Amino acid sequence: MSNRQVTPRTEGWTQKKDESGKPLLQFAEPKRGKPPQHLVDIDPADRAETIKGLGIPGFRAKQLATHYFTHYTSDPADMTDLPKEGREELAQKALPTLLTEVKRLKTDDGKTIKFLWRLFDGALVESVLMRYSNRITLCISSQAGCGMNCPFCATGQAGLTRNMSAGEIVDQIVRANKVIAEGGLGKARHDDERVNNIVFMGMGEPLANYNKLMSAIRTMVEPQPNGLGMSARNITVSTVGLVPGIKKLADEDLPLTFALSLHAPDDKLRDDLIPVNDKWKVDEALSAAYEYYEKTGRRVSIEYALIKDMNDHVWRAELLAEKLNDFGKGWVHVNPIPLNPTPGSVWTASTPEQTDAFIDTLESLGIPTTLRDTRGKEIDGACGPVSYTHLRAHETRHD
């Protein structure tokens, strides 16, 4: 097995630095105009009053919510239960257009779709829709751009443009459900198919947009017709390690799935790989992750992109297992993520032999481990902070 050590570096772009020479982190969004207020942005209990404030009878709020959350439409032509006169104005006021589709790319026999959306101010975000044998998953964005400045991440190159609103976050799901309902995601298995699994692994750091993130999630789990009626257990929030946000998430009354994008068990490497590690070290992030498990009873996922000769050494697998086992058994699961082979780049796939050795080491030390397969290579179907990796087609237990 190789003991060579490759150092993280940017390729084709220059990482922004602060006055001390460290990678620049952006937690506060730049001042920009706000997207139009949408029904999603209003608490269900307040919608009737808000609608009345627009000069519209309050009972119309439930009708509008039914169209949007159940029929996945904001097109006034579909709302035949509303008076024809004023219907268009009503829809525009309560359900303004938040996402404009720029591009749609398909692969995997139509079972994977990557969407590029333009927001009201021209900012661009992506989401990836994937059909599996037992579920339909949507990988969604929470910010336009990202302020975490990771050297491997295409999203972080331009920095943070702005936070997305709760309406913009949820609208990715509604728009995806509309595509599914229209037969746009391969062969349907039944008439009422919809997205039933959400992963916050698209553009942005979810916990850096905490309030809008939680507002969106509460709309997702709110029963129809006031929300999407999804299961909190089928919503995964992934973070690069914003410890205060992890602790806040643990105190929410929702059994969400939590994933920590770790990618290195030692601070020396992770400081360069994940710049926010300079604020919250590996041990702090793992301690917060364990606290999440203790408070919620929900097993934590550790995301670990295997990068050739950078973080795939057996000794790092041993160190990772040691750190995880220090908290006990049964609380965590590791997901090594294979990269695409990229000749000439430092960000390239580990060899099969090194991948096997890394996983065998973790499993021999009692750490449950699942290697992720890839999905969407042909369309660069990257999903999340690790923008060069691809969300799995199946979770296959390593043999």
Residue ranges and their predicted role:
Residues S2-I136:
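Flexible, acidic/Gly-rich N-terminal and inter-domain linker regions that tether
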Residues A65, G376-K377:
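Conserved beta-strand edge residues that scaffold enzyme active sites
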Residues R131-E182:
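Canonical Radical SAM [4Fe-4S] cluster-binding loop centered on the CxxxCxxC motif
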Residues A181-A188, R194-T361, L365:
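Conserved AdoMet/S-adenosylmethionine-binding subsite of the radical SAM
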Residues P368:
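Residue-level detector of anion-binding/catalytic polar loops
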Residues T389-H398:
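Conserved small/polar residues in nucleotide/adenosyl-binding loops
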